[in-house]
Amino acid sequence: MYLKIVILVTFPLVCFTQDDTPLSKPMAIDYQAEFAWDLYKKLQLGFTQNLAIAPYSLRKIFVCLQQLTVSTNPASAALSEQLKNVLKFNPKGKLPDLVRRRYSSQRAMLERENSFNTTTLAAVIGREKKTNSFWDLPNSCAIFVGSLRPGSPKQMSRRFNAAMRNISKSGMQNFLSTSDIDRDLDFLIADSWIFKGLWSYQFEEQHTTTCNFYTNSTSKGLMRFMYLQEYLKYGYFSEWNVEAVELPLHHGSSFSCMLMMPVKADIGVLIKSLNHRRFKDIYSKMSFSKTDVRLPQFTLRIKFSAKSILQQFGFNAAFNESVFHVFDNKNAVPLGDVIQKVKLVMDHDGEQSAKMYVDRRMGNLFIAHQPFIFVIFEKTQLVPIIVGHMVTASTPKDIGPESDEISCDRPPRYQ
């Protein structure tokens, strides 16, 4: 047995004292949500391809890793300062327990949600005895933990991948490559997110079309477009340069999906304008109306190194300083990396059939044949869980001929 994994069936996520009490008023700024938008906006500047990221999870991981630090370690002060400035979490402020409690509540929602398969595994490389704080991560943070025997990158990645495959119930295959791990690493985290939405309404497969997705006036590619007509939350706001529609998930879900497209200019202008306040404003002003949706059928698979991303924003203490106490009777170590993989599937599957209308031409149109943003969010406080965009066509190998122009809803004509 090369990788010792601690797996608990249930997760009492955070331990609180009896003195922990919620705020009497909601927070003026939702820092959890703002970090999600900030990270997405900064990341997309250098990311010209299709994108999906779970910023929610990256922040949660580092909030949880606070328990592996000790105040007497000088490096802890640098980490705390960067948590406050970059990840917008102040471990010395008045609200750390409230923040952790909120993560606990959201994690419980995710555990009940069958549209998500999410797994986080923290592995320490070495034979030395591990600290109790490290072994407690499953209880305190719902992070699986493992002890990985040193070996070649090929050996270690194979053992690590076997553990990820096991705890994700075969959802995540071949998570690490040999280039993700080396003999010098002491501490590594893998973060896997798979979203395959079970919608409230089934897309009508008989009305699937083959149409062009237009990146710009010179770049396009054929994709299969799904079709749905139903009463949905929809909004068109020229003052905010956005057209939006909500695709609700199945009955009882705590999560939903929002699609947004620019009504003028390009998608970069829309992305730069987004923050949590704007997202809430858009959502609050949307209204239910008969809406036709055409959405590309696609699967995105995106892999990130959190180290390379976060260091660009000034968050480097976790990776450069010996700050995490994972070995007993040994000095602290830096975190090698957090490797995040996101798989997002947009497909037909729905809980119920859409209503049949006599006149199918009436109603709003949301035709996603140009770059658009998608947000998978928690419905109570509108916190983004996964956010990203589709900007280039992903043409299936077995794509058929293009449908006629009317079936493709008269796609955009760029000037």
UniProtKB/Swiss-Prot annotation:
The N-terminus is blocked. Keywords: Blood coagulation cascade inhibiting toxin, Glycoprotein, Hemostasis impairing toxin, Protease inhibitor, Secreted, Serine protease inhibitor, Signal, Toxin. It is found in: Secreted. The keyword Transferase does not apply. Glycans are attached at residues 117, 166, 216, 320. Optimum pH is 8.0. Female salivary gland (at protein level). Not detected in female carcass without head and salivary glands. Not detected in male tissues. It comes from the Eukaryota. Residues 1-17 form the signal peptide. Gene3D superfamilies: Alpha-1-antitrypsin, domain 1, Antithrombin, subunit I, domain 2. Belongs to the serpin family. Anticoagulant serpin-type protein inhibiting host coagulation factor Xa (F10). Does not inhibit host thrombin (F2) and trypsin. (Microbial infection) Interacts with Zika virus envelope protein E and Zika virus-like particles; the interaction does not affect Zika virus replication in human endothelial cells and keratinocytes. This is FXa-directed anticoagulant. It comes from Aedes aegypti.
